[in-house]
Amino acid sequence: MGEIQTLNAKQQAGKPVIRLSGISKSFDGKEIIGNLNLDVNHGEFLTILGPSGCGKTTVLRMIAGFETADNGQIVLDDQDVTQVPAEHRHVNTVFQSYALFPHMTVFDNVAFGLRMQKTPAAEIEPRVMEALRMVRLEKMAQRKPHQLSGGQQQRIAIARAVVNKPKVLLLDESLSALDYKLRKQMQIELKQLQRQLGITFIFVTHDQEEALSMSDRIIVMRDGVIEQDGSPREIYEEPKNLFVARFIGEINVFNATMLERIDEKRIRAEIEGVESVVYYDKEAQAGDKLQVLLRPEDLRIEEIKESEEKGIVGHVTERTYKGMTLDSVVQLDSGMRVMVSEFFNEDDPDVDHSLGQKVAITWVESWEVVLNDKQED
């Protein structure tokens, strides 16, 4: 296990551990993956995120060798493995069901892969115990899987996968069977383990919060195509289109019309009947239809009198107290419902808005993301 921990990242820098080139895959005549290209770097925690049926698990299964690509090439650590069977790829998979052998002890479950590889008997025990120490379950070595909690079973499945010293560890929605509190705990532990091992993790999930909290990099997929590739912050704060924006967290989408360009970075636009200045450095003409995107936490609401008209206005129709935040729904005169999330401060007399209260909606200039009609989907 020490070999894994001492991977020389400098030697491998700049060279992907996995390269998918022009990959396509169809089932029963329906294309699931179309001309997909993806590089995965050494020591990276990459998450493939997308709705059910987007092709993310198919990509994982093709990397593992459980599915064969119809077209394209899969390269693993400079070796073309497109036609190499799963058992000869230096890749291990942790499944959603964990797939532990119920009749075997924890020790034997973890040792199974080593024995299948005909590892010398003298090496097996120290390697298994080292793997169990990494997941803090060395004292459970002689127990059976049914004697363990869900979180412990998950850690055993990971220990069984990493004991073989894979170049890449694949995780297929492997936290989804856990309850919320345990899932949050395992997210932290999984990221810590990945840093400790220094090997590449490729994690598949449909849970946006999970992806944002664990990943170095996120691939957002839809219908077999990569919609966006970037860091968690880029994906959340700079979505490339409305699909990504709406899939990753809550977002408000205001329809806007460009009026004029102010300078290289800013334009004047009409948003909900109100002239506003927004940041948009791409080409646009007066009259172009745009969308202005703002997260609920980026918006501010100011209580105003019924007689006042102050920018974009509406009335509070819902309030939800969530401990740290107070979430409000504001209905504009146009009928649009706007979500606003404010940090709750019990000493602030203005934060707990009354239902029916008239409010003005504002935000810090440049916090918005502006898309044109071509980026709508």
Curated annotation (Swiss-Prot):
Binding sites annotated in the UniProt record for ATP: G50, P51, S52, G53, C54, G55, K56, T57
Gene Ontology terms: cellular component: ATP-binding cassette (ABC) transporter complex
InterPro entries linked to this entry: AAA+_ATPase, ABC_SmlMolc_Importer, ABC_transporter-like_ATP-bd, ABC_transporter-like_CS, Mo/tungstate-bd_C_term_dom, P-loop_NTPase, PotA-like, PotA_ATP-bd
PROSITE patterns according to UniProt: ABC_TRANSPORTER_1, ABC_TRANSPORTER_2, POTA
E.C. number(s) listed in UniProt: 7.6.2.11
Oligomeric form and interacting partners: The complex is composed of two ATP-binding proteins (PotA), two transmembrane proteins (PotB and PotC) and a solute-binding protein (PotD).
The protein's name in its UniProt record: Spermidine/putrescine import ATP-binding protein PotA
Organism of derivation: Vibrio parahaemolyticus serotype O3:K6 (strain RIMD 2210633)
